[in-house]
Amino acid sequence: VTALRNPLFRRLLVGEAVSSFGDSALYLSLGIWAKDLTGSDAAAGLVFLFLALPGLISPLYGHVVDRVRRRPLLVAMYGTMALVVLALTLVRSADQIWILYAVALAYGVTFSVPAHGALLKDILPSAAAVSARAALITVRQGVRIASPVAGAGIYLAFGGGTLAVVDAVTFVVAILVLASLKIVESEPEPAGQLFLPAVTAGFRYLWRVPLLVRLALASTIFMATVGLMDTAVFIAIDRGLGQPAAFFGVLTTVQGAGSVVGGLLAGTLVRRLGEARGSSVGYAVFALGAGTFLVPSPVLFLAGAAIYGLAIPLFDIALGTAQHLYVPARLQGRVGAAIGMLSTVAQSVSIAAGAALAGIVDYRIMYALIALTALACAALILLRPAPVPEVVPSVADERAVEHA
């Protein structure tokens, strides 16, 4: 069953494409804007710190997502963001850089709230879970190829204020799409449970499902080294290839193209292989891509970027599908938040480690460590297969049975 046959999902996908375009066009330009205002690389780097910080309290967002209706929550969140980004039209000088940081912080919250994935459980029958994740990742990766260039172009030609208005419009489009959806949502988690047990319920459920915990653990271990790439890639371009920093843009585009192709193929592979084997193949292919960076050749660097771009959708789709299938609707937010928090913390540590090791450790050692870690993740999942749990039906599954 393909999710694209579902009219609700098709409209949701359009809204996701439009809002993703605006999001990535703006938040990637915030760093450029901060640098232009202050002349400081550190000030630009703080933008990405503020983007990451909200992810550290993801379980709180997951708790909220499971206690309310997801569609009204998303509408309220997008409406708030449409107003927040318009504050950027007030920025004129370096002493107003705090507005950029406030917007980045708000974006970080938006990216960390797992309401979108939770809503999918109510919209789609279980048979369409894989194709839905594949379509979403393909669209997001496709958008990310064009949106940074478009965002930077609008910023340079018309200024950050105009870019903020464009982004606000994309949020309005997403709101209109959500408002047009007639969704029968599952009942929210009732009140009455103690706060701490309620907030941490996602971690406890995750631990009780061996397949989910194996996939989440592999993702966390992988993120604990992949952040080294954020530093290693610039050292590799400069010292390994002798290329200008602009070559990073070429690598990013090639990786994005690889991920679009990967998204188109990964749905079929995960459906045939299952979440565990599909994820394992993804990590193994990523290791191959990262390994090509050990040889200082522009051709191999580009090939490697395409290969690991191809791999990313495999383990992303596998983990997202497993969460969709094996987690009840009332826990989707908290389990998604638990997985997101583990990955965010691990990635933040590895990014910081990469920055600290720059100039001390050869970039090839960093890439070798990334490749070996990816192989270890593949082995962790594949060598001791976890039993496949029973699918937890959704309200969409129940409707499908009623209409059968």
Task: Please describe what each predicted stretch is.
Residues V1-F9, I183-L217, E398-V401:
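Juxtamembrane intracellular "pre-TM" segments in multi-pass secondary transporters
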Residues V1-L53, R208-Q255:
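Helix-loop boundary and gating motifs at the non-cytosolic
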Residues L12, Q96-V103, R214-L215, V299-A305:
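Short hydrophobic/alpha-helical segments at membrane-entry points of transmembrane helices
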Residues D23, A106-H116, I307-L319:
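Core transmembrane helices of Major Facilitator Superfamily
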Residues S29-L37, L88-R92, A146-V166, R239-G240, ...:
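Transmembrane alpha-helix termini and helix-breaking/packing motifs in multi-pass membrane transporters
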Residues V47, L60-Y61, V65-R67, R71-L83, ...:
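C-terminal transmembrane bundle of multi-pass solute transporters/carriers
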Residues A104-G142, P148:
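Cytoplasmic helix-loop-helix junction between adjacent transmembrane helices
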Residues D122-I123, A164-Q193, L382-S394:
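Helix-loop junctions on the cytosolic side of multi-pass membrane transporters
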